[in-house]
């Protein structure tokens, strides 16, 4: 997060951002839920300040492997899903859209190479979800 403003200055602000697994590392590190939401909002704020007309596609994150999804982590993920939907509503403006893409529904252990990273089949699943949404947004 700290390097993001400088990186945007060096590279220029994008028109589209695919925001993958927002809050995922925060959840795995055991950070408080509100801190994860604040971190996601801060990243979006930096992106929108760099380009007020930006479109941000943010994931409703796929779950980790069922072996690691404790009841506490499952609750955290479910809270993130709702929090991200709220962020989309709150951060969308007349110029900038923040749109959720559902990676959670239909995702299963067969899509994972380890506890949290996609295998080739999982990458295809994720890519198809992005493609479907991007095709609609770019029409």
PLM features: residue spans?
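Generic structural signal for well-ordered alpha-helices
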Residues: 5, 40-45, 81, 85
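Structural recognition of the beta-strand scaffold that forms the well-ordered cores
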Residues: 15-22, 26-28, 54-60, 97-102, ...
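Second-shell loop/turn segments in exported
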Residues: 25-33, 70-71, 112-118
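Histidine-centered active-site loop/cap adjacent to the catalytic His
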Residues: 114-139
